[in-house]
Regions:
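Conserved active-site alpha-helix within GNAT-family acetyltransferase domains
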Residues: 102-106, 112-137
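Conserved acetyl-CoA-binding loop-helix of GNAT-fold acetyltransferases
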Residues: 79, 85-98
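Short alpha-helical functional segments enriched in proximate histidine and acidic residues
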Residues: 24, 99, 117
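Short acidic (Asp/Glu) patches
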Residues: 58-59, 92-96, 131-138
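Short loop segments at secondary-structure junctions
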Residues: 48-50, 82, 155-160
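A conserved beta-strand-loop-helix scaffold within acyl/acetyltransferase catalytic domains
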Residues: 3-78
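C-terminal "cap" of GNAT-fold acetyltransferases
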Residues: 133-173
Length: 173
């Protein structure tokens, strides 16, 4: 597994990400290697020359109640269907946690419907009122305020996630 700054990706890497992403999220296919917004970094996991695991990463702050947290947000995490249930996703999450522990990150944060997978990998499920910039097809539609129940966080620096409204201070991953 390697982490690349977005700006350093090759055309071939973008093409491989687009193919895996679209195969993994058929209801959200697009003709680019990202869905809503370019992530700051890309995590690529290859077996030979085939991309078998991918996730986008965004580093920023969010506000929870009166607390400000530095978060590493995960977007579009996917593993090639032919190699799922072989530990690739779990290994990628473990390596991501190791990476984050060497950086100034309070929590890893993501949105997913895969509850058992993330709970088994040390994430906590949250149910909280959240606000974020609603973005679709390169256009913003204002600020959304909704209850989210498919949000997961993993503490990296021993902090406890505060109770309260989550302000994403931008778009949601």
């Amino acid at each position: 597994m390697d982490i690349y700054p977005e700006i350093e990706l090759s055309k071939a890497q973008h093409n491989a990400i687009e193919a895996l992403r679209n195969k993994s999220f058929p209801a959200h296919q697009v003709t680019r290697s990202y869905y809503k917004q370019l992530p700051h970094m890309r995590v690529l996991n290859y077996e030979g020359d085939q991309l078998v695991g991918y996730m986008g990463l965004d580093y920023r702050v969010v506000r929870v109640g009166d607390e400000i947290y530095k978060v590493l947000g995960v977007s579009d995490f996917c593993v090639e269907s032919t190699v799922q249930r072989q530990g690739i996703g779990t290994t990628m999450l473990s390596q991501l946690s190791e990476y984050a522990s060497t950086k100034d990150v309070d929590f890893i944060i993501l949105v997913s419907v895969l509850e058992r997978f993330y709970l088994a990998n040390g994430y906590q499920r949250l149910n909280s009122l959240s606000s974020w910039l609603r973005v679709h097809e390169h256009k913003n539609y204002g600020v959304a305020v909704e209850q989210l129940d498919d949000l997961y966080v993993k503490p990296i620096r021993g902090k406890t996630w505060a109770f309260g409204h989550i302000d994403w201070l931008g778009y949601m991953y």
